[in-house]
Design a protein with these regions (language model features):
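Structural motif
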Residues: 41-43, 77, 119
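Mid-length scaffold segments of soluble, non-membrane domains
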Residues: 62-95
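Active-site loop architecture of trypsin-fold serine endopeptidases
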Residues: 130-135
Length: 161
């Protein structure tokens, strides 16, 4: 099973604890913390509207659970997705895949612009096929349900946060 499982909430839709079962971030239990959304922060959010049709058909677990990803760029940063690669502030970060491992076409955010106030770009370089902002574009801060930190990882690895 893949996905982040919300196991406790604050009485609303904002989870306090998440169980991440995807390889794009270390597998394990994460707890929400009072921390700013900044580069390097792990944030949880619902699948953005541009990605929902693909996610609904091919990643149905995301209907129920938030996505957990690392913030790679914030307001003022330049993000480009041309030439089948992600470039942030002039640095090539990763390729952009045309299809998933089943051969299904992935959605794609096409753009080259400075992120606006209230936007972040999320990205994981832990696996080559992470479903992140390369495919659905910037995430609005209003869509973020929290900043999370690892509480108990299943398989800690060097470099894990």
């Amino acid at each position: 099973m893949l996905g982040a499982l919300s196991v406790a909430t604050d009485g609303g839709a904002r989870p306090l604890v998440l169980w991440n079962r995807t390889a794009s971030e270390p597998e394990g239990l994460y707890v929400r913390q009072a921390a700013p959304v900044r580069i390097g922060a792990l944030v949880a959010f619902q699948v953005p509207a541009p990605a929902f049709p693909y996610a609904d058909r091919h990643m149905s677990y995301l209907r129920r659970v938030p996505v957990l990803k690392t913030v790679a760029a914030v307001s003022g940063d330049q993000v480009c997705t041309g030439d089948d690669r992600l470039v942030i502030n002039g640095e090539v970060r990763a390729p952009i895949l045309k299809a998933d491992r089943r051969g299904v076409a992935l959605p794609r955010w096409n753009g080259c612009r400075q992120l606006r106030e209230g936007e972040v770009f999320v990205f994981s370089d832990r696996i080559p096929n992470s479903f992140d902002s390369r495919y659905f574009g910037p995430v609005n801060l209003a869509e973020i349900v929290g900043v999370f930190r690892p509480m108990a990882l299943s398989r800690p690895q060097p470099g894990d946060r």
